[in-house]
Amino acid sequence: MVQQIDAPLREDVRLLGNLLGETLKQHAGQELFNQIEQIRALAKGARDGQAEAEKQLEQLFLELPDEELLPLTRAFSHFLNFANIAEQYHVVRSRRQAEFDPDANSPNPLVHLFKKFKDKNISTEKLFQQICDLKIELVLTAHPTEVSRRTLIQKYDDINACLSQLDQQKLTPRERQNALANLKQQISSAWQTDEIRQHRPTPVDEAKWGFATIEQTLWNAVPKFIRELNELVQDNCQQNLPLHIAPVRFASWMGGDRDGNPNVTHQITQEVLWLSRWQAADLYLRDIENLRWELSIQSCSEEMVQAIGSPHPEPYREYLRATRERLKATRHWLAQRLQGLEADDSNVIKSKDELLQPLLLCYRSLIDSNLPEIANGQLLDFIYRVNCFGIELLKLDIRQESGRHRQAISAITEYLGLGNFESWTEQARQNFLIQELQSKRPLLPKYINEPEGSLIGHPDVQEVFATMRTLADQPPESLGAYIISMAEYPSDVLAVLLLQKEAGIQHPLRVVPLFETLKDLDGAATTMNTLFNMHWYKQHIQGKHEVMIGYSDSAKDAGFMSANWAQYRAQEELTAIARKHGVQLTLFHGRGGSISRGGAPTQQALFSQPPGSISGAIRVTEQGEMIRFKFGLEGIAMQNLEIYTAATLEATLLPPPEPKAEWRELMNRMTDHSVKVYRQTVRENPHFVKYLRTVTPELELQMLPLGSRPAKRKVSGGIESLRAIPWVFAWTQIRLMLPAWLGTGAAINEVIADQQKATLDEMLQQWPYFQTLIDMLEMVLSKADANIALYYESHLTEDEDLKVLGNQLRQRLKDAVETLLTLKDESKLLSDNEVLDQSMQVRKPYLLPLHLLQAELMKRRRDYLAERQAEHTPVDHALMVSIAGIAAGLRNTG
C-alpha cells in the first residue's frame, strides 16, 4: 500500500532522506548514521506488526546515554519535516501538471463549481453579482501551535525551491549538479541550525511573522488568484470583474489579542499597527518603482495631461512621482514613530483611496489610449493589492475578555459614586449603558482619561482605558473588529461601545461577541435578540452584525460532538434571529488546526454549516501552523484562496438541505449522552487530572517557547484553566487524541445498539454536516495509536489508579474505532481516503522512534528534577525537539 504513493513524491522523499543521511555521515559520523538506519529498520518492522522489533527498539533507547538522544531525535524530526516539504511541493507540482493535460480534471474547485451552477440553472447575472459581493476575511492568529522556528521555515522554503528547480525538464547536467549541490547545502544548513527558539517570541515577533506570510506568498498569490477568477467569470458570465474586487481579505490578531496574554499591551498594539503600515508602504514602494519603470510610454488621456498640468514625454512616470514620494514620506514617518521620534505627517498616506486614485487614473488613461494589455499588467496587480491589503497590510482585530470591560465600567461607576457595576442585575447594567451611550456628555472629566492624569482603577483597568485611547489615534482602516471573548450578556457588548465612546473613538470598531462555552453558545441567540430589540442598538449597527463562534473552549468544556452540535444550533438560531430583525449577519468562525478546535478541510467545513448561515460573507481564523500549511507556498496559497471562494459561493447559492426532524432528535440524543460520558471522565474522575499531567507532556509543553501567550489563563488551576491548545497538544503527542473522540464513539454506539443505524446511514448519505463530523472523527482516529499511549503510561507511572484509568481510555478508543467502522460498513479506517492513509504509513517508521524517545526523555527529565531539583539541558533540548518532531509528523499540534 505504501508503494502506491505517487512516484514523483516518493522520489522526492527518498532524495531528501538520502541527502539527510549524507549530511549525518558528514557532520555526525558513520556510527550515528548506522544507528539511525538500525532504528529505522526496527521501526519499519514494528509498523508491519513485528513485536520483537518494537521490543528491541524500546530496549535500545533505554540504554542510550543522554548525549546520544538529541542527535537521534533531531534526525527523525528533520525527516518528518522534509516529508512535509515534499508533500507540499507535490501539491503544487500536481496542479501544474494538470494544466498540461487537457483530459485531466482541473485542480481549481471553481471550475467544477461553475459547471455545477450551470447544471443547477443558477443565472449568470446572479452568479456574477454574488462573486462581486463576496466578503471572505481570513484572520491570521498567533496561537502557539507553530512549533517551527522562522529561521528553519525559510530554509524549508529554500529546499522547496530546489525541488522545483530539479523538476525542470531541460536542465543541463551541470545545472542539475548545481541544483543538487544547493539542495544538499540547504539540508546541511538545516541540520546545523537549532530547531528550538532560545526565547519565546514576543507579540511583535509574531506580528512580523504574519507580515512575512503576506510578503513571501500572498502578495503575489492574491492578484494571480483574482486574474484566474476573472478568466472564469469572463468564460461563464461574459463580464469582467470590477476593478475594486477583493473577494478575500486578511486581518490579524497578532499584537491585538490580549485575552489572557499580559504581554500584549497598548504600547505593543501601537507598535504593531505602525509596523503593519510600514511594511505595507515598503511593499507598495517596491511596486511603484517597478510600475514607473514599466510605464515609460507617451500615450495618455487628456485627464492625465490635466492631472500633470502640462504635456510630458513620460506622463505616467511624472504623474506617479508624487505617489512615490508620498509612500517614501509614509515609510519615513512610520520609521520615526517606531523609534519614538516625532515627525511631520503632512504628506503621509492615511487612507486606501489616497493610494488607489492615482492608480485608477493611470488605468483609465491606458484604456483610453487603447493600451489594455499594459493597463492589465503590473498596474492591475497593484490595484488588486491595494483593494485587498489597504494601507495597513493586515487589519488588526482587538480581543479582550468580557470581565476586563466589566471591571473598567465598575471603576467608572465607583468613581462617580454609583456603586459597583459588576454587582448590578443584567437589566440595570443594560439600562445604565444605553442611557450613557445616548448621552452627549462624557462620563468622566477629561483629565481622568489622560495618560498623565490620576487614572482610576486597577492596573488591568488602566490598561483597558489606555488601549481604547490608542485605538482612537489610528486611521479607521487600520482596525478590524473588537472581539469580546467569554461573552455572556448583552451588557458585554454595550460596555465595549461605551468604553470606545468615552475614549473618543470617532469611527468605533464593530463589536463582536465571541460565544465559546456550551452555555454561552446555547444562549447566543437570546443575547443577540435582546440587543436587536434595543432601538438605539438597532440604529447603531445599521443593519449589519458579526458574531464569533468559538470552537476550542466549547470542545474542551463538553467534548467534540456536543460542542459541534451546539455550534451548529447556535448558528441556526443566530441566522434566524438576524433574519427576523432584518440584520445581515456575518459569522466569524474561530477554528483551529485540530478537529477539537474546529479544524476540517475548508470546503467540507463551510458546506456543512447550517443552510443560510453563509450568505456571501464569512470570517475564519487561520491559526498557528495552519498558516504555513495553507499559505506557505504561493501555489498552495492560490489553491486555498480558490477553495475558500468556491466553498463560500456554493454554501451561498446552493446551500445544504435543512436537517430532518428525526436527524435533529437523534443528534440531541447523541450529544446528551456524549457530554455525559465526556464529563464523567474529564470532570468527575478523581484521577483524570493526575493522568493528564503524568502520562502526557502537558507540563513539559509549558517550557517550549512556542508563542507569547501563557499556556494557562491562570497560574494555578486544573483543566478549566488550561488553554484549549495545550489541552489538545498534550493528548496529540501521546497519540491518544482524547478530546476528539471521548464521548462521541459511545454516543454513536448507543443509538446503533438501539436499532437506529438506518437513520444514521441516511444522515451520513444526505446531510453534509454529519458527513463532515464523521469524516473528521475518522481522520483523528486514524492518527490515534493505543499502543503508543500505553507505552507512555507504562514508562511514566506505576500508579495503579492511573493504569486502571488508562485501560478504560484505551478500551474506549478501541470501541470508538469499532463503532465508526460499523457505522460506515468498513473493515479499516480511511479505506476511502488512501492519500492520508499512505501518508501516515510512510511516517510511522519515523514517528514511532520519536514517541519512544520522548517517553524516555520525559522520564529522565522528571527523574533529574526529583533527584537534583535542577534542569538537565541535553535532555530538555532533546525533549523539545521530540515535541516539535511529533507535531510535524502528525501535521497537527493543537
Swiss-Prot record:
Primary enzyme class: lyase
Catalytic residues (positions): 143, 556
Superkingdom classification of source: Bacteria
GO MF terms, alphabetically ordered: magnesium ion binding; phosphoenolpyruvate carboxylase activity
Cellular component GO terms, alphabetical: cytosol
A GO biological process held by the record: carbon fixation
Obligatory cofactor(s): Mg(2+)
Catalytic activity, reaction form: oxaloacetate + phosphate = phosphoenolpyruvate + hydrogencarbonate
Key words, A-Z: Carbon dioxide fixation, Lyase, Magnesium
Xref: Pfam families: PEPcase
This enzyme's EC code(s): 4.1.1.31
Function: Forms oxaloacetate, a four-carbon dicarboxylic acid source for the tricarboxylic acid cycle.
Homology family: Belongs to the PEPCase type 1 family.
NCBIfam families on file: PRK00009.1
Name by which UniProt lists this protein: Phosphoenolpyruvate carboxylase
Organism, scientific name: Acinetobacter baumannii (strain ATCC 17978 / DSM 105126 / CIP 53.77 / LMG 1025 / NCDC KC755 / 5377)
Lineage: Bacteria, Pseudomonadati, Pseudomonadota, Gammaproteobacteria, Moraxellales
